[in-house]
Amino acid sequence: MKKRIAIVLFNLGGPKNLESVKPFLFNLFYDKAIINLPNPFRYIIAKIISTTRERKSQKIYSLIGGKSSLLQETEEQKLALTEKLKQLIKEDFAIFINMRYSAPFAKEVIDQIKKYNPSEIILLPLYPQFSSTTTGSSVKNFLQNFDIDISIKTICCYPQEEDFIKSHVSLIKEKLYDDDKNFRILFSAHGLPEKIIKAGDPYSFQIKETVKAIVKELNIKDLDYKITYQSRVGPIEWLKPNTEDEIELAGKLKKDIIIVPISFVSEHVETLVELDIEYKLIADKYEVQYTRIPTLGTNKIFINSLTNILLQFINKVDTNLVTSSSSTRICPNEFTKCLCKLTN
């Protein structure tokens, strides 16, 4: 009997207009994976943050058309992935998008899946590196709303997948300065509070694994590069070094800067405003060249990567499987928040 497969793409979500900025912020900060407090405290804090940050965030989104581009970009990735899979598999399939903090929410997507009536479901996060705050939160939220007895296969991460790495390398090579060896590559990832990592989250470990693989594939002798973290907010300790600080340092050294958004596969406010506008101003102050590598988007090699991962999971007979794209747990056992089973 031919399989009928529902594929669910997970992503963050974003406001579709300036009026939806506040509810988006509330949903984000009401997530227990983001603010780990019981109610009513988490609710109150989410209300306060979303209210106090609304106007500032609206001004930021007004710089990029008054909405998040991530919504449209995810639709384009869905279409590209659909076309690629149609060429390669005979099974019936449909791809659904589930955003975590804006529509389409899990309940709505699950209703659509029920109507489709699949024989199995594959969950594919558009977060290459796992974190309990991104993939972990999305998977948990989906499963909490899910009430059908059906096989679910979960792809937890793909930080070292061959074509994922090659897609980054191809975009970096397009922008490398042929006549300039005096540059520094900053691999900029979304930041997280240190306490989340100390609690067993493998995110920074997987970021390092991605960068290690990219640097190896680039094969540039004595490459000057650093891993940095952006979007730091509040007084608590965040992952270091901070992207802004490292741009400042490179500028003082008169090094040209190449920024690679290493944890983002879609353009959104953190790339289009933080990287392209705010951080570029720092480089401009020191009169050094500043080049930002695009996110992977619908890059053909990246779509090949997602396709390869899905084909691998479609062909697996295991039911209710949770593993990385390499079919093994890649995180050391100290990272207790990893979704994969512990290794012996």
UniProtKB/Swiss-Prot annotation:
Domain of life: Bacteria
Gene Ontology CC entries for this record: cytoplasm
Catalyzed reaction equations: heme b + 2 H(+) = protoporphyrin IX + Fe(2+)
Gene Ontology annotations of biological process type: heme biosynthetic process
UniProt-listed Enzyme Commission number(s): 4.98.1.1
Pathway: Porphyrin-containing compound metabolism; protoheme biosynthesis; protoheme from protoporphyrin-IX: step 1/1
Keywords from the UniProt entry: Cytoplasm, Heme biosynthesis, Iron, Lyase, Metal-binding, Porphyrin biosynthesis
Pfam (any one): Ferrochelatase
Chain sites annotated for binding Fe cation: 190, 270
Location in the cell: Cytoplasm
Predominant location category: cytoplasm
Molecular function terms from GO: ferrochelatase activity; metal ion binding
Family: Belongs to the ferrochelatase family.
Primary role: Catalyzes the ferrous insertion into protoporphyrin IX.
HAMAP family: Ferrochelatase (MF_00323)
Annotated protein name in UniProt: Ferrochelatase
Species, as recorded: Rickettsia felis (strain ATCC VR-1525 / URRWXCal2) (Rickettsia azadi)
Gene: hemH
